[in-house]
Regions:
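ATP/NTP phosphate-donor binding region
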Residues: 1-62, 69
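Catalytic core of DAGKc-family lipid kinases
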Residues: 7, 34, 39, 76-195
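Short, glycine/serine-rich, charged loops/turns that create anion-binding
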Residues: 11-12, 93, 197-200, 226-228
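Short amphipathic alpha-helical segments
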Residues: 18-20, 72-75, 99-101, 206-207, ...
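Catalytic phosphate-donor-binding core of small-molecule kinases
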Residues: 34, 165-177, 215-241
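Short beta->alpha linker loops
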Residues: 40-44, 63-66, 92, 139, ...
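A short acidic, amphipathic alpha-helical/loop segment
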Residues: 48, 70-74, 118
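Gly/Ser/Thr-rich active-site loops/lids in small-molecule metabolic enzymes
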Residues: 152-160, 200-231
Protein backbone atom coordinates (compact mmCIF):
# COMPACT_ATOMS: atom_id res chain seq x y z
CA UNK A 1 0.00 0.00 0.00
CA UNK A 2 1.07 3.59 -0.59
CA UNK A 3 1.75 5.68 2.48
CA UNK A 4 -0.57 8.40 3.81
CA UNK A 5 0.00 10.90 6.62
CA UNK A 6 -3.10 11.84 8.63
CA UNK A 7 -2.80 15.17 10.47
CA UNK A 8 -5.67 16.19 12.74
CA UNK A 9 -6.52 19.06 15.09
CA UNK A 10 -8.68 17.92 18.00
CA UNK A 11 -9.37 21.52 19.06
CA UNK A 12 -10.94 22.62 15.76
CA UNK A 13 -14.63 23.40 15.42
CA UNK A 14 -16.65 22.26 18.41
CA UNK A 15 -14.23 19.47 19.16
CA UNK A 16 -16.22 17.32 16.75
CA UNK A 17 -13.30 14.98 16.10
CA UNK A 18 -13.31 13.71 19.67
CA UNK A 19 -14.68 10.20 19.66
CA UNK A 20 -14.89 10.19 15.84
CA UNK A 21 -11.36 9.18 14.88
CA UNK A 22 -11.94 5.41 14.70
CA UNK A 23 -14.31 5.42 11.67
CA UNK A 24 -12.12 8.01 9.94
CA UNK A 25 -9.07 5.81 10.38
CA UNK A 26 -11.05 2.80 9.17
CA UNK A 27 -11.81 4.64 5.92
CA UNK A 28 -8.19 5.69 5.45
CA UNK A 29 -6.55 2.37 6.32
CA UNK A 30 -8.79 0.57 3.83
CA UNK A 31 -6.74 2.16 1.05
CA UNK A 32 -3.49 3.33 2.62
CA UNK A 33 -0.66 2.55 5.01
CA UNK A 34 -1.50 5.34 7.49
CA UNK A 35 0.73 7.33 9.86
CA UNK A 36 -1.16 9.48 12.38
CA UNK A 37 -0.01 12.83 13.80
CA UNK A 38 -2.14 15.03 16.12
CA UNK A 39 -1.17 18.70 15.76
CA UNK A 40 0.56 20.14 18.81
CA UNK A 41 -0.02 23.84 18.32
CA UNK A 42 0.11 26.69 15.79
CA UNK A 43 2.58 26.02 12.99
CA UNK A 44 2.96 22.31 13.73
CA UNK A 45 0.90 21.12 10.75
CA UNK A 46 2.94 23.29 8.37
CA UNK A 47 6.24 22.07 9.78
CA UNK A 48 5.27 18.38 9.72
CA UNK A 49 3.83 18.61 6.20
CA UNK A 50 7.03 20.26 4.95
CA UNK A 51 9.47 18.01 6.80
CA UNK A 52 7.78 14.67 6.05
CA UNK A 53 6.33 15.31 2.59
CA UNK A 54 8.83 13.00 0.92
CA UNK A 55 7.65 10.01 2.97
CA UNK A 56 4.05 10.00 1.76
CA UNK A 57 2.03 9.95 -1.44
CA UNK A 58 -0.91 11.74 0.20
CA UNK A 59 -1.39 13.93 3.27
CA UNK A 60 -4.90 14.10 4.71
CA UNK A 61 -5.69 16.71 7.33
CA UNK A 62 -8.74 17.14 9.51
CA UNK A 63 -9.57 20.35 11.33
CA UNK A 64 -10.64 23.80 10.28
CA UNK A 65 -9.60 25.99 7.37
CA UNK A 66 -6.58 27.05 9.44
CA UNK A 67 -5.32 23.48 9.67
CA UNK A 68 -5.66 23.00 5.92
CA UNK A 69 -3.97 26.36 5.30
CA UNK A 70 -1.00 25.27 7.40
CA UNK A 71 -0.59 22.01 5.51
CA UNK A 72 -0.76 23.72 2.12
CA UNK A 73 1.60 26.51 3.24
CA UNK A 74 4.14 23.95 4.39
CA UNK A 75 3.97 22.07 1.10
CA UNK A 76 4.16 25.19 -1.08
CA UNK A 77 7.68 25.86 0.19
CA UNK A 78 8.75 22.66 -1.60
CA UNK A 79 9.40 22.23 -5.34
CA UNK A 80 6.25 21.24 -7.22
CA UNK A 81 7.45 17.73 -7.94
CA UNK A 82 8.03 17.03 -4.23
CA UNK A 83 4.52 17.90 -3.04
CA UNK A 84 2.22 14.99 -2.16
CA UNK A 85 -1.51 14.98 -2.82
CA UNK A 86 -3.67 16.63 -0.16
CA UNK A 87 -6.99 15.42 1.23
CA UNK A 88 -9.23 17.33 3.61
CA UNK A 89 -11.77 16.19 6.20
CA UNK A 90 -13.47 19.44 7.36
CA UNK A 91 -14.03 19.67 11.12
CA UNK A 92 -13.80 23.41 11.80
CA UNK A 93 -16.10 26.31 12.61
CA UNK A 94 -17.02 27.55 9.12
CA UNK A 95 -15.21 25.19 6.71
CA UNK A 96 -15.20 27.73 3.89
CA UNK A 97 -12.91 25.78 1.61
CA UNK A 98 -14.90 22.58 2.02
CA UNK A 99 -17.85 24.43 0.47
CA UNK A 100 -15.68 25.24 -2.54
CA UNK A 101 -14.89 21.56 -2.99
CA UNK A 102 -18.48 20.43 -2.35
CA UNK A 103 -17.20 17.98 0.24
CA UNK A 104 -19.73 15.81 2.10
CA UNK A 105 -21.11 17.22 5.32
CA UNK A 106 -20.33 14.25 7.56
CA UNK A 107 -16.89 13.25 8.79
CA UNK A 108 -17.22 9.65 7.63
CA UNK A 109 -18.30 10.59 4.11
CA UNK A 110 -15.55 13.22 3.84
CA UNK A 111 -13.03 10.64 5.06
CA UNK A 112 -14.11 8.25 2.30
CA UNK A 113 -13.52 10.99 -0.30
CA UNK A 114 -10.13 11.88 1.23
CA UNK A 115 -9.12 8.22 1.12
CA UNK A 116 -10.36 7.16 -2.31
CA UNK A 117 -11.14 10.37 -4.19
CA UNK A 118 -9.21 11.36 -7.31
CA UNK A 119 -6.95 14.42 -6.95
CA UNK A 120 -7.78 17.64 -8.80
CA UNK A 121 -5.72 20.81 -9.27
CA UNK A 122 -6.48 23.91 -7.21
CA UNK A 123 -4.98 27.39 -7.60
CA UNK A 124 -2.91 28.59 -4.63
CA UNK A 125 -2.21 32.29 -4.14
CA UNK A 126 1.11 33.92 -3.27
CA UNK A 127 1.39 37.17 -1.32
CA UNK A 128 4.69 38.61 -0.05
CA UNK A 129 6.34 35.19 -0.34
CA UNK A 130 3.56 33.54 1.66
CA UNK A 131 0.97 31.17 0.23
CA UNK A 132 -2.75 31.49 0.83
CA UNK A 133 -5.36 28.88 0.13
CA UNK A 134 -8.47 30.84 -0.76
CA UNK A 135 -8.40 34.44 0.52
CA UNK A 136 -5.97 37.25 1.33
CA UNK A 137 -7.70 40.27 2.84
CA UNK A 138 -7.17 43.59 4.59
CA UNK A 139 -9.31 45.94 6.63
CA UNK A 140 -12.44 45.50 8.71
CA UNK A 141 -13.04 42.16 10.44
CA UNK A 142 -10.02 40.44 8.88
CA UNK A 143 -8.65 39.54 12.33
CA UNK A 144 -11.95 38.19 13.64
CA UNK A 145 -11.12 34.55 12.95
CA UNK A 146 -7.80 34.90 14.80
CA UNK A 147 -9.11 36.89 17.78
CA UNK A 148 -12.31 34.94 18.40
CA UNK A 149 -11.53 32.68 21.39
CA UNK A 150 -11.47 28.97 20.57
CA UNK A 151 -13.84 28.32 23.48
CA UNK A 152 -16.40 30.69 21.95
CA UNK A 153 -16.03 29.00 18.55
CA UNK A 154 -16.57 25.60 20.14
CA UNK A 155 -19.67 26.83 21.97
CA UNK A 156 -21.30 29.03 19.34
CA UNK A 157 -19.81 27.98 16.01
CA UNK A 158 -20.24 30.53 13.19
CA UNK A 159 -22.25 32.82 15.52
CA UNK A 160 -19.04 33.46 17.48
CA UNK A 161 -17.54 35.16 14.40
CA UNK A 162 -20.63 37.32 13.96
CA UNK A 163 -20.61 38.40 17.61
CA UNK A 164 -16.89 39.16 17.57
CA UNK A 165 -17.27 41.14 14.34
CA UNK A 166 -20.12 43.19 15.82
CA UNK A 167 -17.74 44.55 18.46
CA UNK A 168 -15.60 46.11 15.69
CA UNK A 169 -18.32 48.15 13.98
CA UNK A 170 -17.35 51.38 15.72
CA UNK A 171 -13.68 51.12 14.78
CA UNK A 172 -13.91 50.63 11.01
CA UNK A 173 -11.35 52.85 9.29
CA UNK A 174 -10.73 53.47 5.57
CA UNK A 175 -7.47 52.55 3.86
CA UNK A 176 -6.71 55.16 1.16
CA UNK A 177 -5.21 53.45 -1.87
CA UNK A 178 -5.00 53.23 -5.61
CA UNK A 179 -5.60 49.81 -7.12
CA UNK A 180 -4.28 49.28 -10.63
CA UNK A 181 -5.64 46.59 -12.91
CA UNK A 182 -5.54 45.73 -16.60
CA UNK A 183 -6.89 48.75 -18.41
CA UNK A 184 -7.38 51.14 -15.51
CA UNK A 185 -7.12 52.12 -11.86
CA UNK A 186 -9.45 53.03 -9.01
CA UNK A 187 -8.65 55.32 -6.07
CA UNK A 188 -10.70 55.58 -2.88
CA UNK A 189 -10.82 54.80 0.81
CA UNK A 190 -11.61 51.12 1.25
CA UNK A 191 -12.61 49.62 4.57
CA UNK A 192 -12.19 46.08 3.26
CA UNK A 193 -10.56 44.32 0.37
CA UNK A 194 -9.83 40.74 -0.58
CA UNK A 195 -8.27 38.63 -3.28
CA UNK A 196 -10.08 35.31 -3.21
CA UNK A 197 -10.68 31.95 -4.82
CA UNK A 198 -13.79 30.92 -2.93
CA UNK A 199 -17.60 30.98 -2.79
CA UNK A 200 -17.63 31.50 0.98
CA UNK A 201 -15.68 33.75 3.36
CA UNK A 202 -16.20 33.51 7.11
CA UNK A 203 -19.27 31.38 6.47
CA UNK A 204 -20.90 34.04 4.27
CA UNK A 205 -21.78 32.66 0.85
CA UNK A 206 -22.11 34.76 -2.27
CA UNK A 207 -18.77 36.55 -1.79
CA UNK A 208 -18.09 36.98 -4.68
CA UNK A 209 -21.44 36.68 -6.39
CA UNK A 210 -20.22 35.29 -9.73
CA UNK A 211 -19.30 31.62 -10.25
CA UNK A 212 -15.78 30.75 -9.10
CA UNK A 213 -13.49 28.19 -10.74
CA UNK A 214 -10.76 26.90 -8.44
CA UNK A 215 -8.34 25.94 -11.21
CA UNK A 216 -8.63 28.63 -13.89
CA UNK A 217 -5.54 30.60 -12.87
CA UNK A 218 -7.72 33.56 -11.87
CA UNK A 219 -8.56 35.07 -8.49
CA UNK A 220 -11.47 37.39 -7.74
CA UNK A 221 -11.04 40.85 -6.16
CA UNK A 222 -13.58 42.61 -3.94
CA UNK A 223 -13.13 46.16 -2.61
CA UNK A 224 -15.59 47.75 -0.18
CA UNK A 225 -15.65 51.54 0.05
CA UNK A 226 -15.88 53.11 3.48
CA UNK A 227 -19.61 53.51 4.34
CA UNK A 228 -20.63 57.12 4.87
CA UNK A 229 -23.74 56.45 6.94
CA UNK A 230 -25.59 53.60 8.73
CA UNK A 231 -27.76 52.98 5.66
CA UNK A 232 -24.73 52.22 3.51
CA UNK A 233 -23.32 49.97 6.23
CA UNK A 234 -26.62 48.11 6.35
CA UNK A 235 -26.45 47.66 2.59
CA UNK A 236 -23.01 46.07 2.88
CA UNK A 237 -24.22 43.53 5.42
CA UNK A 238 -27.32 42.83 3.35
CA UNK A 239 -25.14 42.07 0.33
CA UNK A 240 -23.14 39.58 2.40
CA UNK A 241 -26.12 37.84 3.99
Amino acid sequence: MDKLLFLYNLHAGKGMLRGKLAPILDALTEHWDVTVHPTRGPGDAAAVAHDRAGEFKRIVCSGGDGTLHEVVSGLMTLPEGERPEVGYIPAGTTNDFAKNLSLPGTLNEAAAVAAAGAPRPVDIGSFNDQSFLYVAAFGAFTDVAYNTPQQAKNLLGHLAYVMEGATRLGSIQPHPMTVEYDGGAVSDGFCYGMVSNTISVGGFKGTPAQPVALDDGLFEVALVRQPQNPLQLQGIFKALA
